[in-house]
A protein has these predicted regions:
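A short, basic/flexible loop-to-alpha-helix module at the beginning of a structural domain
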Residues: 16-20, 24-25, 29-45
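Substrate-binding/catalytic subdomain of NAD(P)-dependent oxidoreductase enzymes
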Residues: 213-311, 316-318
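Catalytic, metal-anchored helix/loop core of enzyme active sites in primary metabolism
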Residues: 95, 186-190, 196-201, 205, ...
Length: 461
């Protein structure tokens, strides 16, 4: 699989789901009242409990309370400090509580878990499934680490667990992988899965501002946490990639087994050099299944400026899939936010309710999940950016090391106008495996003229 340069992937309009939130903004903010109107068509009268009343939980409750006809009946809302959370628009017969066990002991049929994290979310979800209650969750950490086990537990108890909101927020990529594309044999998935990183990188690209300034702007706009390490260093994206691998490639992957590279070293000058190569820079999460090996990686990459990935701006998400029969598909939209994520949660809720009431199908059986070997040893062209103290013989020394490691130089780029005490220049390499490149990088890191670690980025064509 080649992302994003294949012909089908370039024709992004041919096979694409565009989420509502990715369309041009309207003059007035969309209301949660515009959520799926066919809630009223579900006649299951399912009793639903909501655990977690933060941004997403509140939006979910608002959709259920303002658009429902009682067929999906919210009966419990559970949260810490619950008295401070109460809202006048919630019906008077809804039970507000901070006692999770009382919710699990009640007669609810579906539990919505929106507290996030592993503890106590894992125990809550296992308890609910163990008692035969279906679960809807947006918890990426939980599904990334325990998804296969939870799917098996649900199957053994005759209930369901749905997690469509755990990746890409309001973009229905996970339901599509588990239902709409289940007839295909997918072999590759790649995506822009973290809106924080995409916002920062696209701001550096468009304004040529320092990384630190772009991060501060993202934090001021609410796109990045005060401690954004999980986003910047790839932890968030690799958890999401593990979920996509489970849903689309039927592969059990521990998130920590996926190599994650930080976007922190990316400099504005890298966008200048990337532009000379017809590229820009994005954080790309990619997984490619070949026989019994899953090649997986998360980190900044050079992508063609006119490719689907290169055109994604701000905090949007894009997922591309490649299948043996159906070819390439693209899913684009808002990857975070209360309303888009709530729509995904409610859509999962409706699917479960319809299954309970009408004997509908279940998604995502875990019986065919395999545990492949995980590798980051992709073969690809490479972009190497150095910062050096200028002196004679630098290129010759670097070329000598690369030749010793059987690496072929493709091009050398050097822009004028920089101080000789801190001179950036770029070497691009012909395709080679990661395992050949890194011993050479370790050797070059010890050269006396280097003043920053070499930035090494894959070039995706």
């Amino acid at each position: 699989m080649q992302f994003p340069g294949s012909d089908v992937a370039r024709m992004i309009g041919d096979s694409i789901f565009v989420a509502r939130e990715s369309l041009p903004k309207q003059t007035s903010k969309p209301s949660t009242k515009a959520a799926p109107s066919n809630i009223q068509e579900r006649r299951s009268n399912c009793r639903v409990a909501l655990i977690g009343f933060g941004t997403v939980g509140r939006a979910v409750a608002k959709i259920l309370c303002e658009n429902g006809d009682g067929s999906l009946r919210l009966t419990h809302i559970c949260n810490r400090n619950v008295e401070r959370k109460k809202q006048p628009w919630v019906p008077a017969d809804v039970v507000w509580t901070d006692d999770v066990q009382s919710v699990l002991n009640s007669d609810v049929q579906i539990v919505i878990e929106l507290i996030g994290g592993l503890n106590p979310a894992e125990q809550i979800v296992r308890s609910a499934l163990g008692s035969g209650k279906s679960v809807v969750t947006a918890n990426k950490q939980l599904i990334a680490r325990h998804g296969p086990d939870l799917l098996q537990l649900a199957a053994s108890k005759g209930c369901q667990i749905e997690f469509g909101a755990s990746v890409a927020g309001g973009v229905p990529v996970l339901p599509s992988l588990r239902t709409g594309l289940c007839g295909d044999r997918l072999h590759g998935i790649a995506g822009i899965l973290n809106g924080t990183c995409n916002y920062i990188l696209s701001r550096i690209e468009n304004a040529r501002i320092p990384f630190s300034e772009a991060l501060e702007e993202a934090q001021a706009r609410g796109y990045a946490e005060a401690d954004a390490s999980e986003d910047l260093d790839g932890g968030d994206a690799r958890a999401k990639l593990a979920i996509l691998a489970l849903a689309g490639l039927h592969s059990r992957v521990a998130p920590e087994s996926i190599r994650a590279r930080s976007i922190r070293p990316v400099d504005a000058v890298d966008f200048d050099y990337a532009a000379e190569l017809g590229c820009t820079i994005r954080q790309i999460s990619r997984a490619d299944l070949k026989a019994d090996t899953l090649f997986a990686d998360v980190g900044p990459c050079l992508v063609p400026t006119d490719s689907p990935f290169g055109r994604v701006q701000r905090n949007l998400n894009l997922v591309l899939t490649s299948g043996q029969y159906g070819g390439d598909m693209a899913f684009l939209g808002a990857g975070a936010g209360g309303d888009p994520t709530a729509v995904a949660v409610v859509s999962d809720l409706m699917f479960v309710a319809e299954s309970l009431s009408a004997g509908g199908g279940k998604r995502g059986a875990a019986s065919n999940v395999s545990t492949p070997e995980i590798s980051s040893d992709f073969e690809t062209p490479w972009y190497l950016r150095f910062f050096v103290r200028d002196q004679p013989g630098i290129v010759a020394r670097l070329a000598q090391i690369m030749a010793a490691h059987r690496l072929n130089i493709d091009s050398l780029l050097q822009k004028p106008g920089f101080e000789k005490s801190s001179l950036p220049f770029v070497i691009t390499l012909e395709p080679c495996r990661d395992s050949l490149l890194h011993p050479a990088l370790e050797e070059m890191a010890g050269l006396e003229f280097t003043i920053r670690p070499c930035l090494c980025l894959p070039i995706l064509r």
